[in-house]
């Protein structure tokens, strides 16, 4: 069994290596090639509606799918992949520079048109879930660190629209009789939130049942 002090030394060495990597990625600034008015998208946060009951609340991970811009992936808390990409000489096309670009990631720069589109997407999605009184907005902070942008999306669901009554209308009345027999299997009921996704699933269920 190796002495405890040897194991401790190895742990310290690993921690030191991580610290050195973080310093290198910071020292070799990942924003050094950016022009005035350009910002690396450093972080995106979604502030969800805490006033909505937890069982009805649309979670941040769900909403993230409708955000058009997300930051570069990170390694050990650093912008390592952007740093690796920036090591490549943009004026040279050879295997070594191509390797750096392949290992790294092209910097994701703040695009306000995509930010605004993201807000529209968030609002549209909340509407589809029955929250027609919902709101979505955003804030961009470019003062925290030079050439870096921190975007916060704020969503408020509001009160949902709920289903009052459910009825089925078929041109062929014989189909209505068949469906009425199977109402116990319906996916939508009075009192449920008016969710377009569930309406689509109910249509699919009926089509499968009739087949």
Predicted features and spans:
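Bacterial N-terminal signal peptides that target proteins for export
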Residues: 1-16
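Interaction-mediating elements
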Residues: 29-211
């Amino acid at each position: 069994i190796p002495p405890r002090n040897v194991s401790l030394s190895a742990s310290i060495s690993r921690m030191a290596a991580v610290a050195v990597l973080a310093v290198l990625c910071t020292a070799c600034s990942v924003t050094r090639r950016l022009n005035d008015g350009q910002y690396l998208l450093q972080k995106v946060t979604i502030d969800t509606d805490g006033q909505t009951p937890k069982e009805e609340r649309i979670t941040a991970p769900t909403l993230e799918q409708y955000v058009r811009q997300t930051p570069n992936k990170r390694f050990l808390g650093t912008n390592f992949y952007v740093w690796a990409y920036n090591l490549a000489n943009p004026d040279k096309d050879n295997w070594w520079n191509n390797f750096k670009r392949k290992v790294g990631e092209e910097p994701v720069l703040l695009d306000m048109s995509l930010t605004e589109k993201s807000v529209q997407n968030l609002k549209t999605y909340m509407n589809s879930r029955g929250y027609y009184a919902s709101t979505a907005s955003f804030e961009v902070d470019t003062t925290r660190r030079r050439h870096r942008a921190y975007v916060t999306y704020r969503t408020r669901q509001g009160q949902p629209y709920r289903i009052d009554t459910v009825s089925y209308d078929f041109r062929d009345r014989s189909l209505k009789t068949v469906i009425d027999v199977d109402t116990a299997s319906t996916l939508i009921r009075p009192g449920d939130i008016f969710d377009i996704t569930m309406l689509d699933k109910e249509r699919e269920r009926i089509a499968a049942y009739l087949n």
